[in-house]
């Protein structure tokens, strides 16, 4: 459907009739306010909420690594690249933004890949009062540094032979695998970062 005016044709007389009534081609843009063209500012409450949620995810991941270093990894220290947990938390928030329950419907399985073998570290349920709608599998990767193997070799021969003296260095790369639990076709998204 097309809206039409009272003009019956587009002849020069009709155009002059428009101009006589005060229509000027440039005036159409002047009728709109400049701010109508600007992208709206994000809601400050949403930004604060997202930042708070991101920080709590960072803490959950750091606690998971801290808990696992003695129990599952058998090392005394885990060195994490700067802002790695921050990047992971932002990606988790991005992947959960399209889900029906958002982050609340997420169950995250945290693993560590060491020499092509995945070791399970923890299972994080974001909100136990919500039925999970998707799973995220986070795979940390060990840094492949030759100097750490040398250091471990030399320190294991002397008084530092305790298994808990070992330092694990994480790579800045990680993998996130998203699996929708409610989808009939079983949509899986794999992101390598």
Swiss-Prot record:
Highest taxon of the lineage: Eukaryota
A single BP term in Gene Ontology: negative regulation of signal transduction
A Pfam family that the UniProt record links to this protein: RTP801_C
Cellular component GO terms held in the UniProt record: cytoplasm
Localization (cell): Cytoplasm
Keywords of this entry: Cytoplasm
Main location per the UniProt record: cytoplasm
Biological role: Inhibits cell growth by regulating the TOR signaling pathway upstream of the TSC1-TSC2 complex and downstream of AKT1.
Family indicated by similarity: Belongs to the DDIT4 family.
Protein's recorded name: DNA damage-inducible transcript 4-like protein
Species whose genome carries this gene: Bos taurus
């Amino acid at each position: 459907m097309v809206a039409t005016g009272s003009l019956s044709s587009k002849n020069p007389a009709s155009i002059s009739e428009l101009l006589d009534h005060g229509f000027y081609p440039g005036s159409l843009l002047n009728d709109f306010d400049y701010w109508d063209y600007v992208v709206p500012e994000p809601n400050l409450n949403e930004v604060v909420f997202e930042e708070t949620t991101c920080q709590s995810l960072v803490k959950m991941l750091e606690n998971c690594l801290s808990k696992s270093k003695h129990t599952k990894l058998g090392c005394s220290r885990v060195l994490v690249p700067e802002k790695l947990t921050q990047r992971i938390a932002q990606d988790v928030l991005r992947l959960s933004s399209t889900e029906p329950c958002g982050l609340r419907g997420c169950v995250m399985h945290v693993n560590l890949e060491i020499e092509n073998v995945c070791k399970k570290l923890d299972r994080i349920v974001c909100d136990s009062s919500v039925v999970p709608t998707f799973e995220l599998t986070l795979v940390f990767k060990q840094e492949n540094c030759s100097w750490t193997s040398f250091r471990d070799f030399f320190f294991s021969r002397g008084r530092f032979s305790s298994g808990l003296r070992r330092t694990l260095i994480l790579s800045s790369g990680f993998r996130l695998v998203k699996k929708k639990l409610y989808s009939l076709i079983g949509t899986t998204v794999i992101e390598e970062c």
